[in-house]
Amino acid sequence: MNLINTIKDCIVERLHVLNAKKLIILDDVILSKLVVDYPNNHDYGDLYTNAALILSKYVKKDPLDVAEILLRELSNIKEISNISVVKPGFINFNLSLYVWYEVISSINMLKEDFANVNIGNGRKVNIEFVSANPTGPMHIGHARGAIFGDVLANLLTKVGYQVVREYYINDAGTQIDVLVESVYLRYKEAAGQDIVIGSGLYPGLYLKEIGQLLYEKYGTDLLEMNSAQKMKIIRDISLKHLLDLIKQDLVLLGIKHDVFTSEAELLRNNVVEKCVKLLEDKKLIYYGVLDQPKGTENNNWQPRKQMLFKSTDFGDDVDRALQKVDGSWTYFASDIAYHFDKISRGFQHMILELGSDHIGYVKRLKAAVKALSDNTATIDIKLHNIVNFLNNGVQVKMSKRSGEFLTIKDVIEEVGIDVVRFIMLTRKSDAVLDFDFVKVVEQSKNNPIFYVQYAHARVCSLMRNAPNILKIEDTDFSVLSSKEEILLIKLLAKWSNVIELSAKTAEPHRITFYLIEVAETFHMLWGYGNKDVNRRFIIDDDINLTSARIYLARAVAYVISSGLKIFSIVPLEEMK
């Protein structure tokens, strides 16, 4: 049940009546611009519409005059109790109380299905997230993007999409060569040789385990093998071992990908060449000289002809190089090929989660997808910013290359998986997030996950102690008349809209914000009962009022439970 859509349908029906009377002009283009939404300020009413503003441009009248025409017709909508016009032409209206009371009934009858909306209609969507380089275990810094991608996948599944979770294994390129060389040193160390870890290599102690595994399996044989043979063995074993570690960390976070795609395998299968051939056939490849990149020292750059992709034809800032000086493919060429592979697998809609340091990839990848699909496929690139990990306000540092970093296992053992999954979504993904190990386990209103869970647990406690109540169809909800009760009901009515908007924008943090607001509003209402016995949820001598308030509380629990399950968090029935 989406109240906005319901009221919007009523308004559209009335606009068609006015159109039939030749009082306005109406067509699909105009209707596509129609907005019905909640105002930012409650003083403006329950909902507003821009109908008069958009229609005024077509009927060539002042928006306020158009609003007066609409006012007379919209006043006939039975769900609307009060309607007004404000400059420059917005129409604000309040809904009849019975509409809000029906929300309580709907939530209690539909339970966690109350906010089910089908905007995906079974369409396939590919969400690629994490894709950490397999050069070491994941550290807790990777958790933000991982949780974002997984919760987004849950959300899109809920609204009717067929979701595939994908991990791109960057198992080709320079960083893998560095990994192999680093592991070989650890193997030599396991074989009893003295080693010196040079600059630029991975010094992490986690590589000692791989070196020991190689020594236990091959003894000193690798020392005698030719370089190509031993490096292949080291590469294969190292990548498998490290990818297994990454998968174990993902399991700790409650995440399981459906597909793992190897960059090296794409290269072996000549997918880059096939992709370049396709772009050549589209006349989107040429040889040219790029301008010197900004910030590049003169002695480090020389102009030269390169194979270039006409990405500026599709909104990019500059055309992009596809080949290096030595003839090997650039990273971007591999990225294009990977997305060509996704499109070839039938994905017309893709979502890619990247760290904010990859912001320069946004335009070029969007351009590539447009070019490869003839503008039929789309890619939505969501950037996540860094997480500042704090211990009572003091920053905790981590670095893969230094060999010392905070592991996902460390954090989950300390605060729990539910805390990690919720806190990682308490800010918009592209904003910096502070994660304080002390504050996230506090049992106070300053800890959002505690406050939300506490609201759910309070309702469960209320239900355990509640007397027998009236059937919902026999309950008169008009007794819920206080300002705070109506405010909570109106907030619960927004749940469907929050789900739909979060899915359409690929912004699951909106759900976090909403659940926190629901919890705060419920706790505030509960607090009034501590000061005034007549404001409590259970009134011994009034079975109808008790029933109405319990159904309201139960609606809160259903909404919170539904939201937490999108995060794969178990709603608590009692706090420990």
Swiss-Prot record:
GO annotation terms (biological process): arginyl-tRNA aminoacylation
Annotated catalysed reactions: tRNA(Arg) + L-arginine + ATP = L-arginyl-tRNA(Arg) + AMP + diphosphate
Annotated EC: 6.1.1.19
Residue positions of motif 'HIGH' region: 132-142
Assigned GO CC terms: cytoplasm
CDD domains: ArgRS_core
Subunit comment: Monomer.
Record's protein name: Arginine--tRNA ligase
Organism the protein comes from: Ehrlichia canis (strain Jake)
